[in-house]
């Protein structure tokens, strides 16, 4: 209702439901005349998918300062895939919050941190383990906006998918579990450029974002995907920052047309 001006705590102002719906329906989000943006990969001098995510995390830590922390398992040893190594190398060791092996606690800690006015980035180490944090994600984080009128600026990174030979619980594709929840923003970047842009933008949203990273795309095999392909790109890091500084949407909610045609497969 329009009378809702505070969240569940009185510490932070929250947008009204009307303001939020107006932002979602804003004409600057979706354009029916989007230009064709073909995918371009480079053999040298580009970033892998993992490198783009690492750089985005460092840039987010630099931008948000003390308001940003990174919460998850094995954080002190850079996580299961070394994704936190760039944060450590950039001097952000103190922002890494190591948690017990309990996804519910990890997500709830992120929610509490977000409600206090910070912008946490949470990691669920493998997709299958998101099931153990399902209640915290769906019945708590996702409901804060529409049930209590609260902001919950939290990004949840989730490595998922096959190509690790890690067995059950480590290869689940979980996007369908959460895609229909109206309180969650679900992102699944497919290229280094998309990964950088979407993670930067996600960190500026006032709602919980599930950021799904396919492990096979990381570039762990000599810079190539788990299928032996090169998807490395020279990543433009300026455009998304320009958009968020102006309060504009950059990629979230917009479709990229990468090839011409009449059918979607």
Where are these regions (language model features)?
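Thiamine diphosphate
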Residues: 3-226
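Generic preference for hydrophobic/aromatic residues in regular secondary structure cores
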Residues: 96, 255-258
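Aromatic-enriched
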Residues: 218-256
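Short, intrinsically disordered, charge-balanced linker/junction segments flanking boundaries
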Residues: 259-265
């Amino acid at each position: 209702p329009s009378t809702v001006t505070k969240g569940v705590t009185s510490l932070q102002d929250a947008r009204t439901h009307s303001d939020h719906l107006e932002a979602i329906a804003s004409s600057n989000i979706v354009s029916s005349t989007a230009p064709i943006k073909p995918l371009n990969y480079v053999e040298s001098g580009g970033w892998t998918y993992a490198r783009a995510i690492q750089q985005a995390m460092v840039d987010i830590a630099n931008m948000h300062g003390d308001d940003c922390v990174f919460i998850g398992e094995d954080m002190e040893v850079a996580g299961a895939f070394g994704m936190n190594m760039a944060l450590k190398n950039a001097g952000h060791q103190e922002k890494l919050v190591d948690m017990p092996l309990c996804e519910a606690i990890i997500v709830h800690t992120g929610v509490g941190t977000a409600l206090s006015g910070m912008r946490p980035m949470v990691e669920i180490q493998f997709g299958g383990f998101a099931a153990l944090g399902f209640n915290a994600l769906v019945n708590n984080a996702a409901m804060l906006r529409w049930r209590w009128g609260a902001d919950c600026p939290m990004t949840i990174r989730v490595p998922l998918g096959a190509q690790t030979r890690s067995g059950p619980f480590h290869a689940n594709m979980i996007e369908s579990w959460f895609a229909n929840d109206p309180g969650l923003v679900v992102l699944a970047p497919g290229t280094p450029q998309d990964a950088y842009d979407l993670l930067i933008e996600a960190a500026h949203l006032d709602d919980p974002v599930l950021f799904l990273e396919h492990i096979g795309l990381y570039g762990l095999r000599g810079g190539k995907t788990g299928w032996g392909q090169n998807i490395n790109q020279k990543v433009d890091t300026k455009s998304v920052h320009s958009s968020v500084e102006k309060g504009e949407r950059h990629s979230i909610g917009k479709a990229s047309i990468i090839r011409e045609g009449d059918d979607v497969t």
